[in-house]
């Protein structure tokens, strides 16, 4: 039972961490729709960094490059939104739309290959080690975010920011800087999720993120905008994926079942918004 649970957590780790990234951005009222592109770019940055800094240890410098990229891009687009009144959703979508193109071009330039960039055997981590690290990182991310938002002054302010920024302004909090810092955390978490995807495969492949960034946004809503709820939603989603993948063996149209979790996620968002609207209308009477 414990082994199966840890295996599920390890498999869900990239999605779980990406969902935490989405949740942080939701707290500050600036939904990070660029998570999909950040995951893809960071997966490429992580693999490229490991290969290009092999003489310096490879793994740590490569992951550091990816985290800095994810945090930096998120902070940059947030600064544009806060100080220049740019539309952060358009900026996030631009990261998603251009990410795949950048990865393809840079992959060809650096490695002469626009399809699969694999780590050499000497740089590959053992599968069991990757699974252990993935599970540990998922647990630490979820637990750390929950404790941070509950017991630290900055975390509490981040949760308040999206609901009542005027109150924080009134007590002297620099809300613009807090938004940028929080979105940097969101970008770093998205980058960590992207790196895990590439480390679990030991390679960079086209469309590495495969829609996980979008699913993460759904899970942040489906989890009721709470850390525990978001984690449970991510684990449930991966469990359903596994169950459906097992059930579709021998079926004539397996794609219908494979797409069921995505349809379920969309249904949860629509249902939640409908329930909230009906509740507000009922309370208004």
Whereabouts are the PLM-identified features?
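Transmembrane alpha-helical segments in multi-pass inner-membrane proteins
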Residues: 204-262
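Cytosolic-side transmembrane-helix boundaries in multi-pass membrane proteins
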Residues: 144-145, 149, 163-177, 244-285
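Loop-to-transmembrane alpha-helix initiation sites
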Residues: 89-90, 116-120, 131-136, 179, ...
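Hydrophobic core segments of alpha-helical transmembrane domains in multi-pass membrane transport
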Residues: 18-19, 43-47, 100-104, 135-147, ...
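Helix-loop-helix "hairpin" substructures at the membrane interface of multi-pass membrane proteins
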Residues: 128-204, 227-232
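Single transmembrane alpha-helix segments in multi-pass membrane proteins
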Residues: 3-57, 63, 68-89, 221-226
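Inter-helical junctions in multi-pass inner-membrane proteins, predominant
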Residues: 3-7, 149, 186-218, 251-257
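Transmembrane helix-bundle core of multi-pass membrane transporters
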Residues: 88, 92, 99-151, 205-206, ...
């Amino acid at each position: 039972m414990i082994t199966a649970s840890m295996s599920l957590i390890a498999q869900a780790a990239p999605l779980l961490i990406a969902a935490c990234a989405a949740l942080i951005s939701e707290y500050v009222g600036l939904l990070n729709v660029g998570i999909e592109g950040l995951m893809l770019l960071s997966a490429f940055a992580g693999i490229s960094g490991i290969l290009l800094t092999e003489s310096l240890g490879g793994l740590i410098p490569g992951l550091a490059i990816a985290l800095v990229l994810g945090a930096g891009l998120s902070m940059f687009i947030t600064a544009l939104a806060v100080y220049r009144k740019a539309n952060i959703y358009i900026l996030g979508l631009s990261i998603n739309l251009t990410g795949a193109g950048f990865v393809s071009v840079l992959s060809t330039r650096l490695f002469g290959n626009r399809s699969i960039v694999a780590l050499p055997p000497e740089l590959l981590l053992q599968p069991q080690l990757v699974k252990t690290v993935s599970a540990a990182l998922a647990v630490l991310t979820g637990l750390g975010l929950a404790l941070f938002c509950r017991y630290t002054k900055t975390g509490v302010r981040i949760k308040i920011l999206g609901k009542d920024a005027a109150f924080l302004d009134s007590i002297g909090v620099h809300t613009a800087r807090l938004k940028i810092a929080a979105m940097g955390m969101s970008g770093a978490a998205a980058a960590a999720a992207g790196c895990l995807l590439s480390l679990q495969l030991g390679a960079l492949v086209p469309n590495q993120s495969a829609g996980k960034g979008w699913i993460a946004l759904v899970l942040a809503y489906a989890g009721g905008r709470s850390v525990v709820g978001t984690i449970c939603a991510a684990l449930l989603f991966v469990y359903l994926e596994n169950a459906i993948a097992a059930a579709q063996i021998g079926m004539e149209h397996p794609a219908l079942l494979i797409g069921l979790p995505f349809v379920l996620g969309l249904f949860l968002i629509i249902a939640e918004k409908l329930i909230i609207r009906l509740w507000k209308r009922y309370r208004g009477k």
